[in-house]
Amino acid sequence: MTKVKICGLSTKEAVETAVSAGADYIGFVFAPSKRQVTLEEAAELAKLIPADVKKVGVFVSPSRVELLEAIDKVGLDLVQVHGQVAADLFENLPCASIQAVQVDGNGHVPNSQADYLLFDAPVAGSGQSFDWGQLDTTGLAQPFFIAGGLNEDNVVKAIQHFTPYAVDVSSGVETDGQKNHEKIRRFIERVKHGISGTK
């Protein structure tokens, strides 16, 4: 069954909703954005997450030192990196890694040392999707996540199109920039039970 990552969580209530609804991954954004949390805030929220739900830290062009500090302080299970990725960034990390790839039309999939790939729109976190026809996942070495403009109305179609390891949502479960608990529940239900949206 396709796994679900709910990203950009910053409140106790949103974390508890995502966990109780069946999220497999909870994402904390450490890069500058409206969803950014500090390591200290994430460490407190992480206490609400059971061991079978994985904690993911989201970074943009981080140093290895930044990753190691966050892994240690928050107890991250995975790191997700956007932007520049140094050749040795993922080597011998104490947790798993995800490399984000912005799908911009050239069809290029990098040769990555990460454990997973995540395919996203050109502007991550914008709520915009990418042209699914521009991405060929045939023969990928790693399991992959699909992100970029997913919501309760299109996520089942995305799963049918790509058969991904997991789907990732942030703005698609928000209302006016804040996580909407009912949208979180409905999104996860659509993924887990294959209920198509109305649009």
From Swiss-Prot:
GO terms for molecular function: phosphoribosylanthranilate isomerase activity. It catalyses: N-(5-phospho-beta-D-ribosyl)anthranilate = 1-(2-carboxyphenylamino)-1-deoxy-D-ribulose 5-phosphate. The gene is trpF. The keyword Amino-acid biosynthesis applies. CDD domains: PRAI (cd00405). Belongs to the TrpF family. InterPro entries: Aldolase_TIM, PRAI_dom, RibuloseP-bd_barrel, TrpF_fam. The keyword Amino-acid biosynthesis applies. Its EC number is 5.3.1.24. One of its GO terms (biological process) is L-tryptophan biosynthetic process. Pathway: Amino-acid biosynthesis; L-tryptophan biosynthesis; L-tryptophan from chorismate: step 3/5. Signal peptide: none annotated. Keywords: Amino-acid biosynthesis, Aromatic amino acid biosynthesis, Isomerase, Tryptophan biosynthesis. This is N-(5'-phosphoribosyl)anthranilate isomerase.
